[in-house]
């Protein structure tokens, strides 16, 4: 259930936790001393939370076997974070991380089942959510669950072995896991996350309406390697304000005008930015995002660089951390630490009187999601408005036809982009 943010609630700043030792494989044999060292460094940067990613294959190697030791390890990491004043959000279905899929053997090859629609697959995932909820629900620093990290990528046409879904099937899967989270950990706020195919890829079963209406908050994952940096430049207005763009785009599809939005994942990829550019990109991205209404917080991807001793990662994945492999904060991490104290206090957002119209069908799905993606006419209208000094908002065509709804949002002027310039979006949520 959505809970509105108190007016005086501080903005939250955190990191997606990538263990410095053995990356996510650390979950196979947890070293709490190493985890504590990592958390100590993050707390020194002034962060207040982390998002963690226990591996699905470690937690649930068989559909009816949820390993008690693995569940205990998740609780131990949550408790360790609390020692350093860090709250913790826990992703359940991993699922997918940094180009690697972690799928239990009971779901693929000889046991292939669509994870979103097969009754046994869904019931197994529900059981995992409930078990983790029972283990974590009384932890004072447990923020809640994300159903899984960008799990919609498993349904995308760009995936090598997709499990396709309709919008109704995607909604049923999200709801089943969120309901399990609410039952098992009712005191926390639970969300789901998608990579940007939900916003930009036509025909994708996960839609903007689902992203903006289900769960306690809308989560936004912003990556400029999706064509934004390639088309406009890594330090362009389009790239610096891409996260803000997605935040404002999500607001157009929310039925609750005060729905909180969490910039849950954003990073500075080396295939789009030079090392010298990354601190400035972080600051520009964060400053643009905090100018939006009802922002819960920002969780940077990621906490620690990946060790070069680990093979086969896309090159950009090795250097996304705020902290290097030597345990020292990198320039990008130091910049984050420098601006957090200034930005933590919530300030009034600028008025957004200019509304860019997103044409939708009877189900509130954009008639052209490609138009919303980098280089599309809706995206370009945003870039042009920002370049001209405006702070634009978005409205659906349904809202644009409702004078009372426009007045409630303070929108006095509309732009209707010509959708004939739409492009077919085919970006993946990783680069391999």
Label each PLM-derived region with a short phrase.
Residues 48-56, 93-118, 126-165:
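Active-site groove signature of glycoside hydrolases
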Residues 27-43, 125-133, 198-211, 279-288:
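Short, acidic/polar
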Residues 125, 284, 288, 292-432:
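Aromatic-rich peripheral "rim/lid" segments of glycoside hydrolase catalytic domains that contact
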Residues 1-49, 64, 79-83, 87, ...:
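N-terminal carbohydrate-binding accessory modules
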Residues 15, 42, 50, 81, ...:
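Conserved, mostly hydrophobic/aromatic
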Residues 20-32, 56-72, 109-124, 160-170, ...:
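The substrate-binding groove and active-site-proximal loops of carbohydrate-active enzymes
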Residues 168-172, 176, 185-271, 305:
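Glycoside hydrolase catalytic-domain groove-lining segments
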Residues 32-107, 164-191:
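Aromatic-lined substrate-binding rim segments of carbohydrate-active enzymes
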């Amino acid at each position: 259930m959505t809970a509105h943010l108190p007016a005086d609630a501080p903005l939250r700043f955190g990191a997606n936790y990538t263990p410095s030792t053995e990356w996510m494989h650390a979950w196979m044999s947890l070293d709490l001393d190493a985890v504590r060292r990592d958390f100590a460094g993050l707390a020194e940067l002034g962060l207040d939370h982390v998002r963690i990613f226990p591996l699905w294959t470690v937690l649930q190697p068989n559909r009816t076997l949820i390993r008690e030791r693995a569940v205990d390890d998740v609780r131990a990491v949550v408790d360790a974070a609390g020692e350093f004043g860090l709250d913790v959000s826990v992703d359940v279905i991993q699922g997918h991380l940094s180009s690697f899929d972690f799928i239990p053997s009971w779901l693929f090859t000889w046991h292939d089942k669509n994870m979103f629609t097969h009754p046994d697959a869904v019931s197994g995932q529900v059981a995992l959510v409930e078990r983790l909820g029972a283990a974590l629900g009384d932890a004072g620093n447990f923020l809640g669950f994300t159903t899984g990290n960008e799990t919609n990528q498993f349904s995308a046409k760009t995936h090598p072995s997709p499990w396709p879904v309709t919008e109704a099937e995607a909604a049923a899967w999200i709801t089943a896991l969120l309901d399990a989270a609410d039952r098992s950990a009712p005191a926390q706020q639970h969300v789901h996350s998608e990579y940007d195919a939900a916003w930009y890829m036509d025909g994708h079963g996960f839609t903007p309406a689902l992203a903006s209406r289900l769960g306690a908050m809308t989560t936004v994952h912003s990556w400029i390697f999706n064509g934004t940096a390639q088309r406009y430049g890594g330090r362009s207005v389009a790239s610096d304000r891409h996260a803000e763009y997605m935040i404002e785009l999500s607001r157009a599809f929310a039925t609750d005008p005060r729905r909180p939005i969490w910039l849950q994942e954003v990073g500075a990829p080396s295939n789009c930015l030079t090392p010298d550019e990354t601190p400035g990109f972080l600051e520009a991205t964060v400053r643009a995002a905090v100018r939006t209404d009802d922002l819960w917080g920002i969780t940077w991807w990621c906490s620690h660089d990946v060790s070069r001793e680990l093979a086969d990662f896309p090159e950009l994945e090795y250097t996304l951390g705020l902290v290097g492999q030597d345990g020292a904060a990198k320039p990008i991490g130091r910049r984050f630490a420098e601006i957090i104290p200034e930005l933590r206090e919530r300030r009034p957002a600028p008025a957004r009187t200019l509304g860019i119209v997103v044409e939708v069908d009877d189900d509130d799905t954009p008639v052209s999601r490609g138009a919303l993606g980098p280089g599309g006419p809706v995206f370009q209208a945003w870039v042009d408005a920002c370049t001209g000094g405006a702070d634009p908002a978005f409205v659906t065509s349904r809202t644009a036809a409702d004078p009372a709804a426009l007045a409630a949002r303070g929108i006095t002027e509309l732009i209707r982009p010509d959708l004939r310039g739409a492009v077919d979006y085919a970006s993946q949520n990783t680069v391999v």
